[in-house]
Amino acid sequence: QHTDVALPHYKPEVWTFPRGALCTIDRSWLWPIGPYLFHGIAETHVSHHISSKIPHYNAWEATEALKVKLGEHYKYCDENVFVSLWKNSRACKFIDENDKVAFYRNVHGVPSAVVANGSKDDNSDSGVNLSD
């Protein structure tokens, strides 16, 4: 939920609660077993980060509302959770601590995504380009 090639990391000087709360991803987790056993926490994880006081039985409705509100900024992965785990364990080794907004890099130092806008000194997460 907290580690994915599409999720940025923020240095303290640019971190805000909304940015931090949205640095997670909803995943389909062992459908239909996961939602039943774990009350949908994997499938509604973004709404849990927005407000952890939302009861699990209302998290599905909250997630649907967030999808509408966040639009393209809502992160969801319906890939098999074990495939995602394997891919992310290979692609997400470290982040570059020199960037205010950083994305995971693989073992060769190749970033999973780059910030498309802004200079090296003042980068922003708007305009993110994901690499293959």
In which residue ranges do the predicted regions lie?
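Hydrophobic transmembrane helical bundles of multi-pass organellar membrane proteins
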Residues: 1-132
